[in-house]
Amino acid sequence: MQYKLTRIDPDAANDQYPIGERETVADPLVEGQVHKNIFMGKLEDVLNSTVNWGRKNSLWPYNFGLSCCYVEMTTAFTAPHDIARFGAEVIRASPRQADFMVIAGTCFIKMAPVIQRLYEQMLEPKWVISMGSCANSGGMYDIYSVVQGVDKFLPVDVYIPGCPPRPEAFLQGLMLLQESIGQERRPLSWVVGDQGVYRADMPAQKDLKREQRIQVTNLRSPDEV
């Protein structure tokens, strides 16, 4: 699996997205095994897996919304959907206490600096979910006042399509984020191991399901599914 080195030096002046460099590398744990004995290599692998397991099963979202997609996001917190099953029910009112933020709705030009400021106030590790067509690509608002995709100024980890997406789509996006977090390579502390942040290049769902969708010959209306 290929990894993308998203942060080389935590104190670097050019660490701000999208100025910071992004380098595609191999799995740092596998490459580092050559210079370690069997015990230390296995111990580091187990520690990374354990820490990633704790991170992905205890994701605290930052509570803010931009448009109608936020209504669908909050619906996922109700009893019929029960987002608590994934450990993401603890809504935080401060970005300094949150693990990930969901850009749910239309992002206007005037709002972009505010969102970026909130993202910078979040502590590492942190992740971003882009929810809905407007957040992904500007949606139907191809005008001067709307940002044509929040990845223009934020590093997005998961894109959720739809206008607006259903709560089930948000839950699927959350599970994809958990899967990605389980493959990440982050420093275990400020003195242990490589201090770079490596994020796995996860395959897009449309690529994984393309063959299955091509084989579909019997098309039905949504009411019959």
UniProtKB/Swiss-Prot annotation:
Quaternary context: NDH-1 is composed of 13 different subunits. Subunits NuoB, CD, E, F, and G constitute the peripheral sector of the complex.
Location relative to the cell: Cell inner membrane
UniProt xrefs under PANTHER family: NADH DEHYDROGENASE, NADH DEHYDROGENASE [UBIQUINONE] IRON-SULFUR PROTEIN 7, MITOCHONDRIAL
Reactions accelerated catalytically: a quinone + NADH + 5 H(+)(in) = a quinol + NAD(+) + 4 H(+)(out)
Species in which this protein is naturally found: Pseudomonas paraeruginosa (strain DSM 24068 / PA7)
Name assigned to this protein: NADH-quinone oxidoreductase subunit B
A GO CC annotation given for this chain: respiratory chain complex I
Keyword NAD attributed: yes
EC number: 7.1.1.-
Primary gene name: nuoB
Record's cofactor remark: Binds 1 [4Fe-4S] cluster.
GO biological process, one term: electron transport coupled proton transport
Keywords attached to this entry: 4Fe-4S, Cell inner membrane, Cell membrane, Iron, Iron-sulfur, Membrane, Metal-binding, NAD, Quinone, Translocase, Transport, Ubiquinone
